[in-house]
Amino acid sequence: MDGATVDTQTRPVNVILLGPPGAGKGTQALRVVDTHGMVQLSTGDMLRAAKDSGTEMGNRVAEVMARGDLVTDEIVIWLIEEKRTGGDAAGFIFDGFPRTLAQADALGALLEKTGHRLDAVIALEVDDEILVNRIVGRAEEARAAGQPVRADDNAESLKLRLTEYYKKTAPLLGYFHAKGVLQSIDAMGELDAIAETLSAMVKDAAI
């Protein structure tokens, strides 16, 4: 958002965005970055950057991805730790990680090791029917604009991704609720209203 005022935190915060595919995590994470000056840690972006870096770790990532295998939690945690090493006054927002209970435990251990804590986990809640409509609509808009369409932007792929989400990632809601850090947002409304609510939650987490 050009010309936006950055609302820096009173202290660095670590925030996780949770939600099913198509909930708008990436979009809202970028808004938090613009508003609060935080750093977005997107595992997808980090893996792609590592793959293209030519480093030893990058070559490992490239080999795993070329085989079509899942990148190990060890590699993902290493990438996150490396990204966090530079530090940032306003903190970090995790987008797309953790996705499993094991990853949540690993992230908690990393934060504790570096003298930090998890301040808030914010779940974006969207009905499955709305998610399907969003994904199908996104694909139709891309086609109309002559842009490439993501291979998984269709109803069938989304249903498979949702099944995986509810099996592996949804249990994190109970996990973080038990730790007292879980909050939720109705993410079926206007983007600006969602962003405003999310921004207030992030600001409160820094108190």
For the regions a protein language model found, what residue spans apply to each?
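Glycine-rich phosphate-binding loop of ATP-dependent small-molecule kinases
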Residues: 1-207
